Curated annotation (Swiss-Prot):
Protein name from the UniProt record: Putative ankyrin repeat protein RBE_1220
Record organism: Rickettsia bellii (strain RML369-C)
Gene3D superfamilies assigned: Ankyrin repeat-containing domain (1.25.40.20)
ANK repeats: 78-108, 113-142
Keywords associated with the record: ANK repeat, Repeat
Taxonomic lineage of the native organism: Bacteria, Pseudomonadati, Pseudomonadota, Alphaproteobacteria, Rickettsiales
InterPro entries referenced in this protein's UniProt entry, alphabetically: Ankyrin_rpt, Ankyrin_rpt-contain_sf
Amino acid sequence: MLEESKALFLELYKEKKKNEWLDAWTDEVMSLVQQQYSNYKLDGILQEAARHDLLPVIENYITRGGNLHIVVLDECGEKVNILNVAAANNSVTVINYLLDNNIFNVDQRVSENSRTALHSAVKENAMESTKFLLKKEQILILNLNINISDLKVK
């Protein structure tokens, strides 16, 4: 499952970046990207798929019996889940899939003292994710350790 997930990730990542970078995406750049991700384990590939909103990688993993309830480390070294990663990076397509398919619930945490997806979105100033998560579920704002006055949700 790892090699298949890596191949799908690289294919989709290449297409996404080609559209963003247009002519800057060369064979040399693709070779560097493949090198970068070649040593990744499955949890790293899934984390990157969530970060880059590459839903087909997540879907493929799930349909093959994979379990997304893995713990990964974010950029600060804190333990988070795939929903946190997606939320912190405005990967709304992945967030919607994970919530609509009841893979995660909106206030799920890795541990009692860890962050929810909304915490991660707000911490990273990921406004699309923040708005989406606030609209998706009724969340008790009083339980959050954030300054609500900083949010400008329409």
